Design a protein with these regions (language model features):
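Conserved catalytic core of the tyrosine transesterase superfamily
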Residues: 1-189
Length: 189
């Protein structure tokens, strides 16, 4: 029996969200929930499915971390920055419902937010500031790329993203060309 080899296809470098675009999105958030959602996605790199499954009890504000259940119900810890902590606390302070879910709909009965709800909201926010193709997964890719660009070891990025294979993480690591040039000058030139 012959082995069937994979056909090599062009690998497109997928876009990330610029720091300026993130600031534009933040500035145009009309409600505390959206701001908290953007900052949590941006600083943790969690999947949208993990985001909507988060409960308030999964968040440890003191340690600035939360427990997420990834693919295959694998539990892992992710960490968020001070800005995300501030915006999450502000959002929770203004909530009036008793739903244990971290992110809920804005209108009563304040149900747990669904994946499609997050996608639609982010798309709307993106369009409001003339940014096309803003979706939850782009925040994940942006976080991974930023972490690697700043020198975080790929194995640690793999752990944060919850990947079992390093190859998967490598696909997220869209290498910044200016960093490649700087590294070349540092090590070679």
């Amino acid at each position: 029996m012959q082995r069937i080899h994979k056909i090599k296809t062009k690998q497109q470098v997928k876009e990330t969200i610029s720091d300026e675009a993130i600031e534009q999105l933040r500035d145009h958030c009309a409600c505390a929930r959206d701001l908290a959602m953007i900052d949590l996605l941006y600083s943790t790199g969690i999947r949208v499915g993990e985001l909507v499954n988060l409960n308030i009890d999964d968040v440890n504000f003191e340690a600035r971390e939360c427990v997420v259940f990834g693919k295959g119900d694998k539990e892992r810890r992710v960490y968020f920055d001070a800005k995300a902590k501030l915006h999450l606390q502000n959002y929770l302070k203004h909530r009036t419902d008793r739903n244990p879910a971290l992110f809920v709909t804005l209108d009563a009965p304040h149900d747990r937010l669904k994946i499609s709800g997050v996608e639609v909201r982010l798309r709307e926010l993106g369009r409001s500031v003339n940014l096309v193709k803003i979706h939850p997964h782009k925040f994940r890719r942006t976080m991974a790329t930023r972490a690697i660009d700043k020198g975080m070891p790929i194995e640690q990025v793999q752990k944060i993203l919850g990947h079992s294979q390093i190859d998967t993480t490598m696909q997220y690591a869209m290498v910044n060309q200016t960093n490649v040039k700087a590294s070349h000058q540092k090590f070679i030139a």
